A protein has these predicted regions:
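Alpha-helical substrate-binding/gating segment
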Residues: 65-73, 80-108
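Catalytic helix-loop patch of NAD(P)-dependent Rossmann-fold dehydrogenases
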Residues: 11-51, 76
Length: 108
């Protein structure tokens, strides 16, 4: 599993799995390096690999409502700013289903 931070800032352009990776944060740089190392290792061992680039993960215990109640919020007020979020249970379902519909070399 990786993260969407590997894409970096695309200045408002639409980002897909096929978009260029140009991370700007240390987390994004580290995750892209890890992706490349895993890919290299799997190629060397002739194994198949799928990469899942996850966005902001939330759960019933960790979400905006919980943070609002606790007073632990960060307000971001930018015009046309969007967030990409995914629930932890959706991640579990996707990973489970990927075992049966494996697509070697795919990035999701």
């Amino acid at each position: 599993m990786s993260a969407t931070s590997v894409y970096g800032d695309h200045k408002g352009d639409w980002v897909t799995e096929k978009s260029d990776t140009r991370p700007s944060s240390s987390n994004g740089i580290d995750r892209l390096m890890a992706e490349k190392l895993w890919t290299s290792l799997f190629n060397e061992k002739q194994l198949s690999l799928q990469i899942f680039r996850l966005s902001g993960i939330y759960s019933n215990e960790n979400n905006v409502l919980v943070r609002l109640k606790s007073g632990n919020t960060k307000i971001i007020n930018k015009e046309n700013h969007f967030f990409s979020r995914i629930h932890v249970e959706d991640i579990a379902n996707i990973l489970f289903n990927s075992l049966f519909t494996f697509k070697p070399g795919e990035v999701f």
